[in-house]
């Protein structure tokens, strides 16, 4: 039998994995996997588990949200020739699952995909020095939604928690002067949102069209949302973001391998839905397909 390392975040998604956990384990066993469980107890546990033990297994998988998957990938980036990654998404919004078409909050269905799926090359983002992101690094409007929403509210309200928190932020959108240097050019101006991503979705609010994103092409999508300048124009800008109208004058989508952001003051970032700290300057890059994701 193949050896499967399964890292479980017991607090993700209101603990919903418990309801069909036995059936999911049977699905994996019937598919030829002998599973060893690792339960996280705090931040970065998944990273350390993956770094320390993944090389001993044929496949590494995790049960949790995008943050758990991000931690696992961060650990695998520290070892040579990492095994392929399976994902049982049990988070609140599950942006990665939305991008790759995995069943969400369905332990049996996702376990079946680990058995029947194919490993696909998956780009990983570099976040400053020695830190990584699986699918997005972002700042500005809406980016605080994921890590600013209280955990108890996430568990109790699910996706609605993000919508409520996002609605609160509409009244306090801040314009941020920034210089952005990327592969083919430079942007200088005021932004209300910026990101570098390998995903079609962030917090279920900002979305890119499926045909714009390829997960293993060595390119990331740089999204820059400019300050409209007037109160009346904010409605047009918000509509462009929410309806994915990328021909809007306020919205730029640029493919790049590298981006450097320079602000006039420290600015808060989110890294895969978690607090990424504040940075006055930050360099992001695309690592071309260092891991493989099963779907």
Q: Can you annotate each of these PLM segments?
A:
Residues 1-63:
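ATP/NTP phosphate-donor binding region
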Residues 31, 40, 78-196:
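Catalytic core of DAGKc-family lipid kinases
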Residues 68-80:
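Short Gly/Thr/Asp-enriched flexible loops that form oxyanion-binding sites at enzyme active sites
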Residues 138, 142, 195-211, 275:
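Glycine-rich phosphate/pyrophosphate-binding beta-alpha loops
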Residues 153-160, 201, 205-232:
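Gly/Ser/Thr-rich active-site loops/lids in small-molecule metabolic enzymes
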Residues 174-176, 190-192, 216-221, 255-259:
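A generic structural signal for short beta-strands and their flanking turns/coil linkers
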Residues 182, 214, 224-295:
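ATP/nucleoside-binding phosphotransfer catalytic cores, i.e., glycine-rich phosphate-binding loops
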